A protein has these predicted regions:
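Short, well-formed alpha-helical segments that are part of the catalytic scaffolds
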Residues: 13-26
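Acidic helix N-cap motif at the loop->helix transition within catalytic regions
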Residues: 16-18, 41-50
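A conserved acidic beta->alpha catalytic loop
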Residues: 36-45, 66, 90
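Conserved donor NDP-sugar-binding/catalytic core segment of glycosyltransferases
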Residues: 94, 98-128
Length: 212
């Protein structure tokens, strides 16, 4: 039985995505699903080679064939997932292997629909999520989500950015039970080039671009 599906959408990250895969603990109750979104570098070839060289990792590699965008790629990843929980490991991030492994061990001890973890960011600071402020919204990277809870929810494929925000909004309307683990398990590449916050700060994304 698959406890956790680790989902990675990737586009032109031929080196960083391998670092993320290297950080994943090797265990029999997880699966890793990577979907390439029409990369023009060696990303897809590197992923296929990695899969061949690491049979200890239960891994599937898919290709969109052309660039479909983050939302469409995320929807395809979710459709392929088999785990009771899923987690998005972004292609330029890594997990803190031992802590992440511990958190997977503890997943069944949580009764929540969402299990949140704390994040380590680029400057060495730790984002300790504050339960009193409902901070599990902060990034999709900080959450293990029970797959059955979000059945029927999809990422909107017609927005230019912020697709994870719309997914989160619809998910929260279902009033999930959120549990905060307090475990620092994810190394978040923040601020990341191309993030919603980064694009808005540089004037490359306007509020009207965030309309579904």
């Amino acid at each position: 039985m698959i406890k956790l599906s680790i989902l990675t959408p990737v586009w032109n990250q031929e080196k960083l995505v391998i670092k993320g895969l290297d950080s994943i603990p090797r265990r029999d109750d997880i699966e890793v699903i990577v979907r390439d979104d029409g990369s023009t570098d060696n990303t897809l070839a590197n992923l296929r080679k990695y899969k061949e060289e690491h049979p200890e990792l239960q891994m599937r590699v898919y290709s969109n064939g052309k660039n479909l965008g983050v939302a469409a790629t995320a929807n395809k990843l979710l459709a392929a997932a088999k785990g009771e929980f899923f987690h998005f490991l972004m292609s330029d991030d890594t997990v803190l292997t031992e802590n992440y492994n511990t958190l997977i061990d503890q997943l069944y001890s949580f009764c929540g629909d969402i299990v949140a973890m704390d994040l380590l960011v680029n400057n060495g600071d730790v984002w300790h999520l504050d339960e009193s402020k409902d901070e599990a919204w902060c990034a999709q990277a900080c959450r293990f989500i029970r797959r059955s809870f979000v059945e029927g929810i999809k990422y909107p494929e017609k927005v230019k950015a912020g697709e994870d925000w719309f997914f989160h909004k619809e998910m929260m309307e279902r009033k999930p039970k959120v549990e905060y683990s307090g475990v620092v398990a994810y190394r978040y590449n923040f601020p990341r080039e191309g993030s919603l916050m980064n694009l808005r700060a540089r004037g490359l994304i306007a509020d009207e671009d965030l309309q579904p």
